UniProtKB/Swiss-Prot annotation:
The gene is gcvP. GO terms for molecular function: glycine binding; glycine dehydrogenase (decarboxylating) activity; pyridoxal phosphate binding. The lineage of its organism: Bacteria, Pseudomonadati, Pseudomonadota, Betaproteobacteria, Burkholderiales. Belongs to the GcvP family. This is Glycine dehydrogenase (decarboxylating). The keyword Oxidoreductase applies. Its cofactor is pyridoxal 5'-phosphate. One of its GO terms (cellular component) is glycine cleavage complex. InterPro entries: GcvP, GDC-P_C, GDC-P_N, GDC_P, PyrdxlP-dep_Trfase, PyrdxlP-dep_Trfase_major, PyrdxlP-dep_Trfase_small. The glycine cleavage system is composed of four proteins: P, T, L and H. It comes from Variovorax paradoxus (strain S110). The modification N6-(pyridoxal phosphate)lysine is found at K713. Keywords: Oxidoreductase, Pyridoxal phosphate.
Length: 968
């Protein structure tokens, strides 16, 4: 018998090892799946699905795949090029200590970071409780009535505050006043947002102060910083009163840590309060991700943008959390939505809320008092040296007039590894934080001490009085709910975090087959680098020479993404897909204006589009015209042609999703692009479904002008329960000059300002996508696309006799997702798509996308990461559910009393003394025998959505409510 040949060293090194870790289907699985679909090979399948006219002419040019160990080592070398200085820049970004129990058990825990946005309330109670804690924390600290469940960053939250004010007040003015004492990046983002909406932004200056600007009364809103970016604590109460006399809204960008000591804006009649929670446990991360917040008066709540967690009851009368007032949002109201915000910053919001739970009101107050005390000591020492701070009041920040000494002090600071705030004429700024030490104060004094002047002695100044105005001191209590006063030991905190994560269903438990969401593997090796100090402890406005590693990461990732999409340029600044859409449409609008075509203001959008598309279009001042889809779910080309001809002179853009939101590759997409170009418009190809394109087709090659990507879909950044995300905007050559700039960071653009607070957006999660691309290589990325398509078609084929696929190509194939049509079942059995979604919970699954893009359907996207066993488990569950529906159709079970109508089944409901249903308790709990081995138990029954909106309650539930329901 011949001895088998030994593998070569190259084979043993196995550079492509990660492909098999990321892709759940192997060659043997393929051999089983392909005959079910009716194809002999994967190549044959792809050739029959992806139109030949759009296939890539050449493979992607990317580095060969690296092993996990090699990729981590390579990225570590890049990270080492960043210089981690002690940053006292402030400007909205501060050092913080992330408690280890939160770092390990939330930020680095897949039970938290792999979860999806909590649309399915019954399997999201844990993170919604954490988000309700977040909302309560914000309301308590700001003194406002209601707060949402996070915004993208402080600057975009301020821009949303501006538009919220515009929608909510009586004033008909188009002028928005902004204090020059606001953070400069906030002012820039506000100006970017205001311009296409016809809002005039007036910024106060030294000579033209905010009170002076307010004299005319011609404005609809005002924004002030509290404390100011210079550190001064202004008394804003008179200005708030004057704004109300003018029928305008008074908005405040407030520091939450400072509000533990300062009178909250809600107590002096502010209307809207926004800001960031970054310093509540999230590192600076070169600008993100961090959870911003937005709070307002109760009467503004129906115009409040973003997610809002509210309290309702389940079918058993128990308190239950849910997303409230969703009719405000883009997925329902489309171009009439309050905002295009979709993905926000849930994971950082959970970190911030846990930080508040862990420290409690006393701990937060102590941290704030220590910061204020150190600031007073620093200020008094500087005054002794003749460097009296300009701001007589302060919480954590000082502005020092340095005149001609400025360059010398900066040079000394750099030599000492210290960053000071430099963008103040003849002045330098210093901001302290939770991490500041006695040694830091002494180092700072040494930088400013004039020659021959003795250094102050720290101990002599230890009793310096904080520089807070007496009449603005906080006297009201906050965070009084027991949740903020119970979990003080690490043991208690650990168990609280675990108790919440146990209530939820995330990717660490099962497949999440959500269509249009691409819930793929977030590999551990991809996640590890995000908390490296070289990435996490970098200030976004540090000097460029300290950001060399980030610059290399940025350049490489942009190059790889351009290669994947076929575009010429890309910006990574947008910190969500919604912001990428906004930036892309802004580029189109700016291009038309620069070319004397500013009158082009019509945006054509197919009726099947995601709600962010029309919401984003209206944000840049475009008028949305909806075009039809045909019976097969494709863009109706005849209707589109009529619309193009009708609006030819005004056509700015057409927005499409490709493959379509209906889950098919439309064969006439190149023709569509050519038609739009003939009429002077540009083609926006929504990148939501890029997981079906990478390696096989590129939007920039088949006619797209602009696309945004969702790195939290296609390129492995986790969804985090609803954020963070990254939405890079990709453009063709002539639109590159109109990508977002960032004047605050010295990044120029052709009149297009910043769309995010930080120049690199959610910079700290970019290493995740870098690692994914580096380990997969061109071959792996294309294989991922092809397997995603294979898996979707396998599910569609196996379920076709039970649930017809609504849309497919002429040969019966789908793209990377399929829409299962459940509408006929409602007539035959009374069972709805929602009933099936809830029953899937009993089988241990997160439901597919419910009733989008077609009401009464389920859209399934398995991704390439799921193994065949999990696909089969899902298919078996769906077939078993169809069997249950058949028993209703046959009259075995009543239409209103069956396992689907009462799903999901909680352990408590199954153990009730009485069981009045015509099916067994066992069937309710264990519809398949295998579930007896491992079972996810939903913590609540089905949520009453109507009750929740009629009885809106958006802060922590009084403990008594739980006791009452238990006694009942």
């Amino acid at each position: 018998m011949p001895i088998p040949a030994l593998p070569s060293l190259q084979q043993l090194e196995n550079a492509e090892e990660f492909l098999a870790r990321h892709i759940g289907i192997d060659a043997a699985d393929e051999a089983r799946m392909l005959p079910v679909i009716g194809s002999e090979t994967r190549a044959e399948l792809i050739d029959g699905i992806v139109p030949a006219a759009i296939r890539r002419a050449k493979p992607m040019r990317l580095p060969a795949p690296a092993t996990e160990a090699d990729a981590l080592a390579e990225l570590k070398a890049i990270a080492a090029k960043n210089k981690v200085f002690r940053s006292f820049i402030g400007q909205g970004y501060y050092g913080t200590h992330t408690p280890g129990v939160i770092l390990r058990n939330v930020l680095e825990n897949p039970a938290w970071y792999t979860a999806y946005t909590p649309y399915q309330a019954e399997i999201s109670q844990g993170r919604m409780e954490a988000l309700l804690n977040f909302q309560t924390m914000v309301c308590d600290l700001t003194g406002m009535a209601i707060a949402n469940a996070s915004m993208l960053d402080e600057a975009t939250a301020a821009a949303e505050a501006m538009t919220l004010a515009k929608r909510s007040v009586k004033s008909k003015s188009n002028v928005f006043l902004v204090s020059g004492d606001c953070h400069p990046q906030t002012i820039e983002v506000i100006k970017t947002r205001a311009a296409p909406l016809g809002i005039e932004v007036k910024v106060s200056t030294v000579s033209e102060t905010l009170p002076h600007l307010m004299v005319s009364g011609e404005f609809f809103g005002v924004l002030a910083q509290y404390p100011a970016t210079t550190g001064h604590v202004h008394d804003l109460r008179p200005l708030a009163g004057h704004a109300h006399q003018c029928d305008a809204a008074f908005c405040v960008a407030a520091d939450l840590l400072a509000l533990t000591l300062l009178a909250p804006p809600g107590e002096w009649d502010a209307d809207i309060v926004c800001g960031t929670t970054q310093r509540f446990g999230m590192p600076m991360c070169n600008g993100g991700p961090h959870a911003a917040y937005l709070a307002c008066r109760d009467e503004f709540k129906r115009s409040l943008p973003g997610r809002l967690v509210g309290v309702s009851v389940d079918t058993h009368g128990q308190p239950a959390y849910r997303l409230a007032l969703q009719t405000r949002e883009q997925h329902i109201r489309r171009e009439k939505a309050t905002s295009n915000i979709c993905t926000a910053q849930v994971l950082p919001a959970v970190v911030a809320s846990m930080y508040a739970v862990y420290h409690g009101p006393d701990g937060l107050t102590r941290i704030a008092q220590r910061v204020a005390a150190l600031t007073a000591i620093l200020a008094q020492g500087l005054a002794q040296m003749g460097r009296e701070p300009v701001n007589g009041t302060a919480f954590d920040s000082l502005t020092i007039r340095t005149g001609d000494d400025t360059p010398k002090i900066i040079e000394r600071a750099q030599a000492a590894g210290v960053n000071l705030r430099q963008r103040l004429q003849q002045h330098l700024g210093i901001s302290l934080d939770e991490t500041t030490t006695r040694a830091d104060i002494e180092t700072l004094w040494a930088l400013f001490v004039p020659a021959g002047t003795p250094m102050p002695r720290f101990d002599d100044l230890a009793n310096a009085v904080p520089r807070l105005p007496e009449d603005l001191r906080r006297t009201s209590a906050f965070l009084t709910h027991p949740v903020f006063n119970t979990h003080k030991s690490e043991t208690a905190m650990l168990r609280y975090i675990r108790s919440l994560s146990d209530k939820d269903l995330a990717l660490d438990r099962s497949m999440i087959p959500l269509g249009s969401c691409t819930m793929k593997l977030n590999a551990t090796s991809e996640m590890i680098p995000i908390t490296w100090p070289e990435f996490a402890n970098i200030h976004p406005f540090a000097p460029a020479e300290q950001l060399v590693g980030y610059a290399q990461l940025d350049a490489q990732l942009r190059a790889w993404l351009c290669e994947a999409t076929g575009y010429a340029g890309i910006s990574l600044q947008p910190n969500a897909g919604s912001q990428g859409e906004y930036a892309g449409l802004l580029a189109i609008r700016s291009f038309h204006e620069a070319n004397g075509q500013g009158h082009r203001n019509i945006c054509l959008i197919p009726s099947s589009a995601h709600g962010t598309n029309p919401a984003s279009a209206q944000m840049v001042g475009l008028q949305v015209v909806v075009t039809a889809c045909d019976a097969q779910g494709n863009v109706d080309m005849d209707d589109l042609r009529r619309a193009c001809e009708k609006h030819s002179d005004k056509l700015a853009a057409v927005m499409i999703t490709y493959p379509s939101t209906h889950g098919v590759f439309e064969t006439r997409v190149k023709e569509l692009c050519e038609l739009v170009h003939e009429h002077g418009g540009r083609v926006y190809v929504d990148g939501a479904n890029m997981n079906a394109l990478v390696g096989v087709a590129a939007p920039g090659e088949f006619g797209g002008d602009v696309s945004h990507l969702n790195l939290h879909k296609t390129f492995c950044i986790p969804h985090g329960g609803g954020g963070p995300g990254v939405g890079p905007v990709c453009v063709v050559e002539d639109l590159v000059p109109y990508l977002p700039g960032h004047a605050t960071a010295g990044v120029a653009s052709n009149g297009v300002g910043a769309v995010s607070a930080a120049p690199l957006g959610n910079a700290a999660v970019l290493p995740i996508s870098w690692m994914y691309c580096r380990m997969m290589g061109a071959k792996g990325l294309q294989a991922a696309t092809e397997i995603a398509i294979l898996s979707a078609n396998y599910i569609s084929a196996r379920l076709k006799d039970h649930y017809p696929t609504l849309y497919a190509s002429p040969n019966g194939h789908v793209a990377h997702e399929c829409i299962l049509d459940l509408r006929p079942l409602k007539d035959s059995s009374g069972v709805t798509a929602e009933d099936v979604a809830k029953r899937l919970i009993d089988y241990g699954f997160h439901a597919p996308t419910l009733s989008f893009p077609v009401p009464g359907t389920l859209m399934v996207e398995p991704t390439e990461s799921e193994p065949l066993a999990e696909l089969d488990r899902f298919i078996d569950a769906m077939i078993a559910i169809r069997g249950e529906i058949r028993r209703v159709e046959e009259g075995v079970w009543p239409k209103d009393d069956n396992p689907l109508k009462h799903a999901p089944h909680t352990a408590a409901s199954l153990m009730a003394a009485e069981w009045p249903h015509p099916y067994s308790r066992e069937l309710g709990a264990f519809p398949l025998a295998e579930l007896k081995l491992a079972k996810y138990w939903p913590p609540i029954g089905r949520v009453d959505n109507v009750y929740g909106d009629r009885n809106l309650f958006c802060s922590c539930v009084p403990v008594g409510d739980y006791k009452e329901t238990e006694e009942a």
